[in-house]
Amino acid sequence: MSGNTIGKLFCVTSFGESHGPAIGCIVDGCPPGLVLSAMDIQLELDRRKPGTSRHVTQRHEGDRVEILSGVFDNITTGTPIALLIRNEDQRSKDYSKIMDVFRPGHADYTYWQKYGIRDYRGGGRSSARETAVRVAAGAIAKKWLHERYGIVIRGYMAQLGPIAIPFKNWEVINQNPFFVADDDYVPKLEAFMDALRKSGDSAGARINVIAEGVPVGWGEPVYDRLDADIAYAMMSINAAKGVEIGAGFNSVTQKGTEHSDEITPEGFLSNNAGGILGGISSSQPITVSVAIKPTSSIRLGRRSIDKAGNPVIVETHGRHDPCVGIRATPIVEAMLAIVLMDHALRHRGQNEDVVCTTPKVPGNIINPTNPVTTQPDVRRAEDPEPDENS
């Protein structure tokens, strides 16, 4: 199997299956000198790990990360960083009834047709379990980006099934099990999920993520555009079925006078472009929205076929997320961080010495209530100033 690596200079290669002994990744290209401990990574993993509420899978994995190489005395050495997370709570017998059938909407059928063999236990390589190591790698990228450039990457759930959740403030996002930015909606979401779980069905979600503080100039046209690489990374996430950047599909109904973001010496007047123009970052906040499909493994009977091609009814019993989108926010943040760090290193390698006499337009801070409007650029007191010499 190929296609297990993302990135050109900051490269992440993942390995492992849902019910194997462990999952892990190799992070290659991280510069030396970054202060990094297992706790830096664990903090992000704990946001994603299963079994944290009744609304997600009850598979209880500690997701304790082990740093096997690339770090000495809590400082990155510039050599490959090997990260390992051991699987501790597999229950493979739950999948014995589907070993010879294909779950509708799942990768079972296509993996079987492509490889002629598949690990049916928990979906094997196609399981969302693999995303834990993306979060681990993304934790490294998030820390490096923040320390070198002051970049802040934050996400939140904007919709769960039919329920759209407005943005209220960032502070409550990590204080509720849904990563929503308005905790007044939590009781409504809990009632929706309780009813969904009892029905045996599943639901989708929409995750928004914003990167603030990205300098102007990152991105490699034409085939390695920053927005193209972001979309590629997001669509590699299990269950992702759509990506929008900036105004996204709303651009279809806009006129040019509405969509094009006017520029003033004080900043941009809107952010329909989502912080990217011509595949290159504009210094505006990068805004991304990802659609997560409903979980394929559900208890309700669905028509399918077995390995012999015979019609069957498939019911999936086991510990599954009724909505994988509930735990997707840290994953989406991680993938954006990985792409941005890769492009930061690529830009530094070729264009660090470029001098442009035109003054740089301030990158206004996004207004999360409306992702295409902006606010004055006010850096948070705790954020470091960008280090142009790093």
Curated annotation (Swiss-Prot):
Gene3D superfamilies in alphabetical order:
Chorismate synthase AroC
Q: Which UniProt keywords apply?
A: Amino-acid biosynthesis, Aromatic amino acid biosynthesis, FAD, Flavoprotein, FMN, Lyase, NADP
- EC number(s)? 4.2.3.5
Pathway given for this chain reads: Metabolic intermediate biosynthesis; chorismate biosynthesis; chorismate from D-erythrose 4-phosphate and phosphoenolpyruvate: step 7/7
Give the note describing cofactor binding and stoichiometry.
Reduced FMN (FMNH(2)).
The family annotation for this protein states: Belongs to the chorismate synthase family.
Q: What does this protein do?
A: This reaction introduces a second double bond into the aromatic ring system.
Q: How is this protein named in the record? A: Chorismate synthase
Q: Which gene encodes it?
A: aroC
